């Protein structure tokens, strides 16, 4: 593979890395309108450009060219136009706290004060106001501007449309200034009431995360429980699917020449990968009735010290069907981990979720799975072995075994995994999951997908050849409380403790929409209050969960697509409502993560940058 093809592959990787949750976001392929920060920024800049001439006229009218106040003691508030039309404050009077009302009808409460924020005017960490008097009166100090924008962002959080709707409203600059003057008046009113001791109190750097909520018990809901076998069958592909026999595992360490594709998510052996593709790419390679084995590589999981290799899995097709549009539905299952040398790739590999048109082949090597059984279970103690399965004698028997071996207790426990499996089983009982495999190799991969680890941990698990080490790593994170965060603004969306299985494969499953885009979906009972908004209308077309309608949900802060709400349309179906979070739009993080809890800092920082540029 030459340098030109390598450069094109890297370009595709960057495109996928930056396009998580792209246009084909709905199960039916319905597009979510782009609503990213760049669009909001352009909107704010347009507002400033439209009011540039008005700003200059008002400054000269009220203050004069030098910025001096025309009349001592009066601080005018500019209106939406140079002549003051449409503004209640065109006469130059400063609005009172009670009169400040945002365009969405939300009143500005003068008592707003975000604890621990570095944007607070009364905080010891706020910017120095010593140079405020030296500035022209019509200029807004940076710390007051920051506090006003922070307040507007917090109020917009509880309104439909989120931050994008806030930026798209008219008179944005006027509302920012009104908020500043309202807070200034409140500050002067309360300055005498604040004691010196209170000012010296240090506040926490970040507001605490919302407290965990009590778990929902689906067994208490009335109605017929949803059949978790239905999503696993991917029945939304239609009834015209034919079973393809044959499951072939390749010998460990062997090298094979096979068709390869790229994928934006990490697949572990045992997972099902549904996709839609031009059948002509497979017809020539499928021999008889045996299922085709092909390779799927993960370019976003390149180890930094080994960038010339790609890691992935082999997949075997076990079901296929025609959709009548020159495309073929396929269902495949991941079998074994593989490694690919980039120099062995013949052709340009394409993403399997983007309707590939060209074939690409390469040599792949099957990676091993090393598993060492528990040392004490390998010791045959003759007639005493019968005490191993007696609960009352198990501990005594274990101590006797350890005393008769040359290894210390730590060595024996290092390779013990039954305790880890039991703790994982108890944790997953909350999620109503009872499909844990018994084979240690398959169980290690299954636990990685259902315990919801961070992306870094998942990559580490995939690259580990030792099953024992993989289980030890899993045991180390069982007690950690984790949340789903928006990948774009770090706003907290849902608790991982609210996960539950709507599919027999677990809480995280991959689904395909009619556009061919593959979504990794995490099902949760509920999301954090005021964390989401909605886009478009609900629909039952191509629903991944039969009997439920889907509705696109957006992050309330950044208005980016983060998943779907599923609501039962058939009577007596339980659960009545649940949510599917798109893996491309969310990330897993610890509850005490240093990242922003509610996304305020991210949004405020970008809004302040644009406002500052517009006021220069």
Curated annotation (Swiss-Prot):
<dbReference type="GO" id="GO:0046872">
    <property type="term" value="F:metal ion binding"/>
</dbReference>
<feature type="compositionally biased region" description="Pro residues">
    <location>
        <begin position="206"/>
        <end position="215"/>
    </location>
</feature>
<keyword id="KW-0833">Ubl conjugation pathway</keyword>
<feature type="region of interest" description="Disordered">
    <location>
        <begin position="1"/>
        <end position="39"/>
    </location>
</feature>
<keyword id="KW-0832">Ubl conjugation</keyword>
<feature type="binding site">
    <location>
        <position position="555"/>
    </location>
    <ligand>
        <name>Zn(2+)</name>
    </ligand>
</feature>
<feature type="compositionally biased region" description="Low complexity">
    <location>
        <begin position="11"/>
        <end position="32"/>
    </location>
</feature>
<comment type="similarity">
    <text>Belongs to the CRBN family.</text>
</comment>
<feature type="binding site">
    <location>
        <position position="489"/>
    </location>
    <ligand>
        <name>Zn(2+)</name>
    </ligand>
</feature>
<feature type="region of interest" description="Disordered">
    <location>
        <begin position="63"/>
        <end position="137"/>
    </location>
</feature>
<feature type="compositionally biased region" description="Acidic residues">
    <location>
        <begin position="96"/>
        <end position="107"/>
    </location>
</feature>
<dbReference type="GO" id="GO:0016567">
    <property type="term" value="P:protein ubiquitination"/>
</dbReference>
<dbReference type="InterPro" id="IPR003111">
    <property type="entry name" value="Lon_prtase_N"/>
</dbReference>
<feature type="binding site">
    <location>
        <position position="558"/>
    </location>
    <ligand>
        <name>Zn(2+)</name>
    </ligand>
</feature>
<protein>
    <recommendedName>
        <fullName>Protein cereblon</fullName>
    </recommendedName>
</protein>
<dbReference type="GO" id="GO:0005634">
    <property type="term" value="C:nucleus"/>
</dbReference>
<comment type="pathway">
    <text>Protein modification; protein ubiquitination.</text>
</comment>
<feature type="domain" description="Lon N-terminal">
    <location>
        <begin position="257"/>
        <end position="482"/>
    </location>
</feature>
<dbReference type="Pfam" id="PF03226">
    <property type="entry name" value="Yippee-Mis18"/>
</dbReference>
<keyword id="KW-0862">Zinc</keyword>
<dbReference type="GO" id="GO:0030177">
    <property type="term" value="P:positive regulation of Wnt signaling pathway"/>
</dbReference>
<feature type="compositionally biased region" description="Basic and acidic residues">
    <location>
        <begin position="183"/>
        <end position="192"/>
    </location>
</feature>
<comment type="function">
    <text>Substrate recognition component of a DCX (DDB1-CUL4-X-box) E3 protein ligase complex that mediates the ubiquitination and subsequent proteasomal degradation of target proteins. Has an essential role in mediating growth by negatively regulating insulin signaling. It also has a role in maintaining presynaptic function in the neuromuscular junction synapses of third-instar larvae.</text>
</comment>
<dbReference type="InterPro" id="IPR004910">
    <property type="entry name" value="Yippee/Mis18/Cereblon"/>
</dbReference>
<dbReference type="GO" id="GO:1900075">
    <property type="term" value="P:positive regulation of neuromuscular synaptic transmission"/>
</dbReference>
<keyword id="KW-0539">Nucleus</keyword>
<feature type="region of interest" description="Disordered">
    <location>
        <begin position="182"/>
        <end position="220"/>
    </location>
</feature>
<feature type="compositionally biased region" description="Acidic residues">
    <location>
        <begin position="194"/>
        <end position="203"/>
    </location>
</feature>
<keyword id="KW-0479">Metal-binding</keyword>
<feature type="domain" description="CULT">
    <location>
        <begin position="481"/>
        <end position="590"/>
    </location>
</feature>
<comment type="subunit">
    <text>Likely a component of a DCX (DDB1-CUL4-X-box) protein ligase complex. May interact with pic/DDB1.</text>
</comment>
<dbReference type="InterPro" id="IPR034750">
    <property type="entry name" value="CULT"/>
</dbReference>
<feature type="binding site">
    <location>
        <position position="486"/>
    </location>
    <ligand>
        <name>Zn(2+)</name>
    </ligand>
</feature>
